[in-house]
Regions:
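Active-site-proximal beta-strand/loop segments in catalytic clefts of secreted hydrolases
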Residues: 88-93, 181-185, 237-240, 262-266, ...
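Secretory targeting and sorting signals
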Residues: 3-5, 14-50
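Extracellular hydrolytic enzyme modules, especially secreted metalloproteases
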Residues: 172, 177, 185-339
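Zn2+-dependent metallopeptidase catalytic core
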Residues: 51-220, 228, 246, 405
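Non-catalytic C-terminal accessory/binding modules of secreted extracellular proteins
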Residues: 3, 57-69, 200-217, 298-423
C-alpha cells in the first residue's frame, strides 16, 4: 500500500472553569483550553442498547470497537437511518488555498455515500453537508506539527483552534458526523495524519455532544476509500490491519484485501458480513446460526450483491460459535457492488474475536489455499487474495473442528455450502 494506515486516537480532557466572550461558542473552546491529548488503547464500554441478535451473536465486551453484537454501544451513531455529516474546510495563514472546497468534496462524495449505500443494501444513507468556504485557522499549518504520530499537545491545539473558528458559522446540533478537512497544499499538512479522534468525555457545542471528529489531511486526489474507512470508526468498527510493533513488516496479514477496515486499497473492500450484522444491515434469516454438532446445508447469497427489488435478501452469513467470545463466520463473496474489483470469488471463512481490541486482530481471514497466492501485482496481500473456497473444494479449519464444503453454485449466483461441525 502507498502509505501506512493510522489507528484512531483518544483525547482525554479535564474541565476547568473558563469564560468565553462569545455566547455561541459555549463550552467548545473552554473545554479545549484544558485538553490533555493522550494515545489510548481502549475506552470504557458505552451504554448498551438491546439488540435481538440471536444465539450465535458474541457478547459485546469492553474492548475498543468490540465485535460483540448482542448490544449496540449507544456512544456511537448507528447507521441504520439517514445520518448527516458536516464538512468543514480549514485554511492556514501560511498558504493561500490553490483548490476550491467543492473539489475536495468531490474527492470523497458521492463515492463514500455510495459505498455505504451498497454495503447496507440501501438501509443507510450518509448525507454530506459541506460548507463551501475556507475557514481561516489562527496559526500557520507548520505551527501544529501535523504528522502521523502526532504530539498530543499539538493535536490538542489544532482541534481547539479548528472547533473555535468553526463554531460561529456551523450549527453542530444539526449533524451526526464531523469532518475537519485541512487545505491539502498547506506546507504543514501531512496526509498520513488522517484519522478519527475520540473524546473520552464529549464536548458540548450548540446543545449537542461532540464525541469524535474525523480529521482529514488527505492529498488531492486522496487515497481510495479513505473516508469510508475513517467513517467506519465513527460507527464503532475496528481497524482490521496488523500493526507491527517495530513499525516494520506487512500490515495486511490479518484480512488482506477483504473489508475496507483492513485496507482502503483492498480489491474487495465491502464490509464483512459480521460488520453488516453489527451495524443492523443483516439480521433474521439473513444470518444462519450453524448447530454445534452435525451438518448443515446452506445457500449463501453473495454478500456484495444487492437483493432484487421486492425479493428476499436470502442468507448472507453463516456463523459457527466456537467460544464465549469467538466464532467462525462463513460468507460468499462475488464481484459486484463494492467488490467489483475482487481478485477471487468464492466462500470466505474468517475468525471473529469479540474480546480483541481494534488493531489487535479482531478478525482473521482463514487461508484455504495456504500454498498459493493471487493477483500479486494488485493485491495488498497476495497470500490471502485467493482465500475463498471455490466449487468442489473442501477445507477443515485448523483447531476449530469445522469443515466447509462448497458443493455447487446456483443459476442465480448463490453458493451451496455444507458446513460440518464437531469433526
Amino acid at each position: 500500500m502507498s502509505r501506512i494506515p493510522q489507528p484512531e486516537v483518544h483525547v482525554e480532557r479535564r474541565l476547568t472553569p473558563g469564560g468565553v466572550d462569545r455566547p455561541r461558542l459555549r463550552s467548545t473552546a473552554a473545554a479545549f483550553t484544558s485538553l490533555v491529548a493522550v494515545a489510548a488503547t481502549s475506552l470504557v464500554a458505552g451504554p448498551a442498547v438491546a439488540d435481538p441478535a440471536g444465539p450465535c451473536a458474541l457478547p459485546r465486551t469492553t474492548a475498543h470497537h468490540s465485535l460483540g453484537l448482542d448490544t449496540w454501544n449507544a456512544s456511537y451513531p448507528r447507521p441504520a437511518r439517514t445520518l448527516d455529516a458536516v464538512m468543514v474546510f480549514l485554511s492556514f495563514p501560511d498558504a493561500a488555498p490553490r483548490i476550491e472546497p467543492a473539489d475536495l468534496v468531490a474527492d470523497h462524495f458521492p463515492a463514500t455515500s455510495r459505498f455505504f449505500e451498497r454495503a447496507s443494501y440501501g438501509k443507510f444513507a450518509l448525507h454530506p453537508h459541506p460548507r463551501l468556504q475556507w475557514i481561516d485557522m489562527p496559526r500557520a499549518s507548520t505551527d501544529y506539527a501535523i504528522k502521523r504520530d502526532w504530539e498530543p499537545a499539538m493535536r490538542t491545539a489544532y482541534l481547539r483552534d479548528a472547533l473555535a473558528v468553526a463554531d460561529p458559522v456551523i450549527d453542530f446540533s444539526r449533524y451526526d458526523v464531523v469532518y475537519l478537512v485541512a487545505d491539502p497544499d498547506a506546507p504543514g499538512v501531512d496526509s498520513d495524519a488522517t484519522k478519527v479522534v475520540n473524546f473520552d468525555h464529549p464536548l458540548t457545542a450548540d446543545g449537542t455532544d461532540i464525541k469524535r471528529v474525523v480529521t482529514v489531511f488527505e492529498r488531492h486526489p486522496p487515497d481510495r476509500n479513505v473516508l469510508a474507512h475513517e467513517t467506519g470508526h465513527v460507527f464503532d468498527l475496528p481497524d482490521l490491519y496488523h500493526r507491527p510493533t517495530d513499525g516494520k513488516g506487512d500490515w495486511d496479514t490479518h484480512v488482506g484485501d477483504w473489508d475496507v477496515m483492513g485496507s482502503q486499497f483492498g480489491l474487495s473492500p465491502d464490509l464483512f458480513g459480521w460488520h453488516k450484522w453489527k451495524l443492523g444491515w443483516l439480521g433474521g434469516r439473513q444470518v444462519s446460526c450453524v448447530k454445534p454438532i452435525g451438518s448443515s446445508m446452506l445457500t449463501l447469497e453473495p454478500l456484495d450483491a444487492a437483493p432484487p427489488a421486492g425479493a428476499s435478501a436470502g442468507t448472507r452469513l453463516a456463523v459457527v460459535r466456537t467460544g464465549e467470545h469467538s466464532a467462525l463466520a462463513i460468507e460468499a463473496r462475488g464481484s459486484t457492488g463494492n467488490d467489483a474489483t475482487t481478485c477471487t470469488e468464492g466462500v470466505l471463512i474468517y475468525r471473529v474475536r469479540g474480546g480483541t481490541e481494534s488493531g489487535g486482530g479482531p478478525i482473521e481471514v482463514v487461508d484455504t489455499h495456504p500454498d498459493s497466492e493471487a493477483c500479486w501485482d494488485q493485491s495488498v496481500y497476495p497470500p490471502l487474495a485467493d482465500a475463498p473456497l471455490g466449487v468442489g473444494e473442501t477445507f477443515t479449519v485448523p483447531g476449530e473442528g469445522t469443515k466447509v464444503e462448497v458443493a455447487d453454485r446456483t443459476r442465480t449466483g448463490a453458493w451451496t455450502v455444507k458446513v460440518t461441525t464437531g469433526v
